[in-house]
Structure formats: C-alpha cells, structure tokens
C-alpha cells in the first residue's frame, strides 16, 4: 500500500482512497503506512467495506490520524443503520453511506436516523434517472454525495461522470479509475490523468462502442 501511495502521489494524485477490512490491527497499520508514504498534504478517504464493528469504528476514528480523513465510507454492515447513526453522531469524521442506501427505502432509513453526512454511489440504485431522484431526496435533507467507479467499463464510468459533473451535491474528489480490467468495449477507453478523467464532449454519454469487441466479449 505504501509503495502504491508513493507512486500515485508522484503521478499527481491529491486524494487517496484506502480500502480496508482485513482486521483492526492491519487496518490501523495500513492507514498509518499510507499516511506516512503520501505525506501530510494528501487527502485520505477510508473504506472498511462494512467490516468494522461499532466499537472498532469509533476506536479507529479516534486514532491520531482519524480526524484527518475526508470521510469514512460504510464502516459497518449495511443493515445496521442504527449503528451507523451512532457512529456518525459520535465521530469527528464525516460518515458516508454506500451499501446502506442502495434503494429509496434504504435511503429513507438513513435520513430518518441522520446516519450519514453524504452518499456514495447513487447510480447503484438503478441508473441516472433513479440517481437524480436519490440526490434530490438527499438534497432536501442536507446531505452531499460522491460517485465511485472501481470496476465499470467506460460506458458505466461515462454515465457516472455525467452525474458527477452535473450535480451540485457532488463536491468531493472523484473516486474513479480503471481497476482489474483487461479490456474495454469502446473504441477509445476513458483515461485518467493524476486521478482525474478528461471531459466527454461527444454526443450521448461521450463514448462509442467497439462492435467487434462487444461481439467477442459478449456472453450468451
């Protein structure tokens, strides 16, 4: 993790997201290693992937580097919104709801308990149209948002980028890059420079499918 953090900072990335969830000791060591490697001027987001208990979350965010996080994404299991709310009210760090708010009904529960400061991945609720409904509801209740793409092809990432650029609620560093992908299905895959994607100026989503790749990679 430390070596990757140093490389990304050298490439110009100003915000790093640290994926956690092995165990509490490993997570704390990982956070410290990334912070030391990245330096004090780099913003950190941490994502425990629902693996922390309420007690662990409060302890981790009480560590010296804890208040330094931009936000902590979904620290506890998605169904335990009450614990998420208690963490949010006790923590000096912003709390983001991800898996806990995949649907309108789930978001309502998060809003009722004031369990988050922001939403992550509103597109997971069913596309751009549904995401706008989610964002409108979040806006009424004073929440912000961010978007995340970690395994999408260029088509899905392009949709996410349009949402990111057009919503006033999305005020955080964009969490998107190409991870784990060996191939794409568009003629010119999206590119990120220093963690930032270029603007899409072509019609529609701004990307054009490669018919031959779609045919070859399709599953029947």
Q: Where do the PLM segments sit?
A:
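Metal-dependent enolase-superfamily TIM-barrel catalytic cores that perform enediolate-based chemistry
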Residues: 1-91
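C-terminal extensions of enzymes
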Residues: 180, 184-220
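Electropositive phosphate-/nucleotide-binding environments in soluble metabolic enzymes
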Residues: 2, 28, 54, 78-81, ...
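Shared catalytic-loop signature of beta/alpha-barrel
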Residues: 62, 68-71, 79-96, 101-196
């Amino acid at each position: 993790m430390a070596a990757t953090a140093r490389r990304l900072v050298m490439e110009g990335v100003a915000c790093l997201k640290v994926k956690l969830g092995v165990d509490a000791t490993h997570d704390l060591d990982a956070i410290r290693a990334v912070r030391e490697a990245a330096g004090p001027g780099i913003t950190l987001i941490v994502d425990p992937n629902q693996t922390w208990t309420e007690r662990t979350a409060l302890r981790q965010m009480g560590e010296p580097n804890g208040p330094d996080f931009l936000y902590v994404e979904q620290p506890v299991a998605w169904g335990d919104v009450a614990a998420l709310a208690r963490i949010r009210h006790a923590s000096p760090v912003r709390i983001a709801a991800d898996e806990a708010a995949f649907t309108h009904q789930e978001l309502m529960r998060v809003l009722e308990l004031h369990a988050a400061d922001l939403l992550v991945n509103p597109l997971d609720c069913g596309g751009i149209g549904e995401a706008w409904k989610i964002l409108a509801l979040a806006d009424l209740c004073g929440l912000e948002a961010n978007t995340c793409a970690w395994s999408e092809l260029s088509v899905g990432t392009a949709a996410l980028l349009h949402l990111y650029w057009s919503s006033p609620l999305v005020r955080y560093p964009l969490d998107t890059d190409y991870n784990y992908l060996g191939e794409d299905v568009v003629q010119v895959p999206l590119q990120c420079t220093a963690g930032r994607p270029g603007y899409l100026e072509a019609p529609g989503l701004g990307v054009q499918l490669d018919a031959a790749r779609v045919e070859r990679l399709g599953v029947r």
